[in-house]
Amino acid sequence: MFSLSSTVQPQVTVPLSHLINAFHSPKNISVSVNTSASPKQHRDTVAEHEAPSSEPVLNLRDLGLSELKIGQIDKLVENLLPGFYKDKRVSSCWHTSHISAQSFFENKYGHLDMFSTLRSSSLYRQHPKTLQSICSDLQNFPVFIQSRGFKTLKSRTRRLQSTSERLAEAQNIAPSFVKGFLLRDRGTDLESLDKLMKTKNIPEAHQDAFKTGFAEGFLKAQALTQKTNDSLRRTRLILFVLLLFGIYGLLKNPFLSVRFRTTTGLDSAVDPVQMKNVTFEHVKGVEEAKQELQEVVEFLKNPQKFTVLGGKLPKGILLVGPPGTGKTLLARAVAGEADVPFYYASGSEFDEMFVGVGASRIRNLFREAKANAPCVIFIDELDSVGGKRIEFPMHPYSRQTIIQLLAEMDGFKPNEGVIIIGATNFPEALDNALIRPGRFDMQVTVPRPDVKGRTEILKWYLNKIKFDKSVDPEIIARGTVGFSGAELENLVNQAALKAAVDGKEMVTMKELEFSKDKILMGPERRSVEIDNKNKTITAYHESGHAIIAYYTKDAMPINKATIMPRGPTLGHVSLLPENDRWNEIRAQLLAQMDVSMGGRVAEELIFGTDHITTGASSDFDNATKIAKRMVTKFGMSEKLGVMTYSDTGKLSPETQSAIEQEIRILLRESYERAKHILKTHAKEHKNLAEALLTYETLDAKEIQIVLEGKKLEVR
């Protein structure tokens, strides 16, 4: 028993045990209040176990001490029971705390580390790095705050609530693209049906009807959703099937499969092409070659006609000729006439960097062809794959491709019904085993077209454009000696482009002549500004060529002379033969040399030896080539006789010296003949040069008028 005095209440006498029980009651109430008030203590919850007590519980109200504050009770208890809390805290070896301190040292010992305090002072302070500052800012984000506690049912409930609260707080600091990731598993809070009816104040009499309507609407919505899902599923299935059919169609298309189809290993995809739109009617100017290939077409159409008599058609046909004469077009026409599959391959497509790729592609090509026999295999630029085999240690595997080609064409296994057509510009470079009978045992020459062939080709291409009725293809054909079919096609196309640029509705002879001059002499360069001195030198230089060509008996006729810069030259004189030349006589070769010398001779006679130019370099090259061929190839030297000297590097020094001496004699004699002609016709030379300075370009008729001493009409 003890007495307690206070200014507020009169003196009251209570037992000590009652006072202690009353003291514990408000302490527990205050702790629970403080725990619910602090959000941090929500995260650090500890399981509370309350043991049942049989003793009656007294509170301050029963004792008449309800007006005392908790702080006053703590102070009174500490004064009455000194060392109560201190002894209780010291008796335990652990310091329990629900909230973590700033450091592990403070959590363990209960006070700060002096060394850490000094280090955090201004004397030891360092500027934080960028990455360190970012990490320190991130650790304060709610999403990174750790939550520790015992895994009890109550703590689990509170942890789930705190997690949802942190996610809600994270929405304000997280970027927009992270919010969906953070909240992807958060479901929508659904309100129960009973709670909804209570909120809407629906009477109990109408609640059954409300539930029935809600159920019917839910079932209808489910049916509609199921129908929509089924429709989407069917649509996706249809699109997938269409995609598969599209890919299959691309792979089977003969024109697109080469690009889109891939094969296993290193073999390339091989697909035939039907040439139904190309026949022999499209081939002009090579009548003899077409007749040779008619036998192949007949065999492909009617093979029994030949097998009954015991005859066999050639397995391979070799087309030989200069570029642009129509070798590829002939091969396509053969396949088109016979209406059989056509396999095209270039000689450079077989070999690559990997060993054995060429032979593998040859096998693949012939395997596909045999499966689709009868058919035609056309190998363009055959010399690229079928060249002569030589001993070369750097590439010992380069001969595998040609050996495989030889075996496929005439090996142990026959290839009935497969016709191989090869095309090359250099038949002398092919291997001898490739062109023997049984492989390429038929050789067809495809030459440049003659006047008749050029006329047919020009008519064929002119019918594809709009041209004037005054256009005469024979005149253009006579002026395009040596042109191939491809060059004639280019001539007509250039004329059509010129007419379109000039705004004309159809092509006339003027555009065709312009196109011919552009091909023979090069395009005009009208923007080049040449001073009068160089223009005068060019006029006399070109006039010298024209005078020699006009007054030399066996020289080719003049087609046109111009001092307009064309291509790399400042002027040009075009010469064209009247008819096709199948052979050239010695006098014609000497005349060509004389015409080449005319430019330099004119410069020397008019301006002196100190003012000759470098413009005659190409003329000297042409004259030297003609003289060298006359001596070493044509046997036109009296001293060396009828003997050819193909490899001058293997000749003796005396023979080489004799060849050079003969070439030098021919060139000197040609130079003297040109000088004699220009001295004899000095007046005509001057008149022609002045006419070129006035008109810049003169054709054959205008040159003849000037040399006859007549005046030209004003243009």
From Swiss-Prot:
Positions contributing to Zn(2+) binding: 541, 545, 619
Function, in words: ATP-dependent metalloprotease that catalyzes the degradation of folded and unfolded proteins with a suitable degron sequence in the mitochondrial intermembrane region. Plays an important role in regulating mitochondrial morphology and function by cleaving OPA1 at position S2, giving rise to a form of OPA1 that promotes maintenance of normal mitochondrial structure and mitochondrial protein metabolism.
Catalytic residues in the record: 542
GO terms of biological process kind: cell population proliferation; cellular response to starvation; mitochondrial protein catabolic process; mitochondrial protein processing; mitochondrion organization; negative regulation of apoptotic process; neuronal stem cell population maintenance; positive regulation of mitochondrial fusion
Record field: transmembrane: 238-258
Keywords: ATP-binding, Hydrolase, Membrane, Metal-binding, Metalloprotease, Mitochondrion, Mitochondrion inner membrane, Nucleotide-binding, Protease, Transmembrane, Transmembrane helix, Zinc
Organism of origin: Rattus norvegicus (Rat)
Tagged with keyword Oxidoreductase: no
NCBIfam families associated with the record: FtsH_fam
Record-listed E.C. numbers: 3.4.24.-, 3.6.-.-
Family: In the N-terminal section; belongs to the AAA ATPase family. In the C-terminal section; belongs to the peptidase M41 family.
Subcellular location: Mitochondrion inner membrane; Mitochondrion
Catalytic activity: ATP + H2O = ADP + phosphate + H(+)
GO terms for cellular component: mitochondrial inner membrane; mitochondrion
Record gene name: Yme1l1
Note describing how the cofactor binds: Binds 1 zinc ion per subunit.
PROSITE patterns reported for this sequence: AAA (PS00674)
One MF term in the entry's GO annotations: ATP-dependent peptidase activity
Start and end residues of each stretch annotated as Disordered: 31-54
Subunit structure: Homohexamer; may also form heterohexamers. Exists in several complexes of 600-1100 kDa. Interacts with AFG1L.
Listed name of the protein: ATP-dependent zinc metalloprotease YME1L1
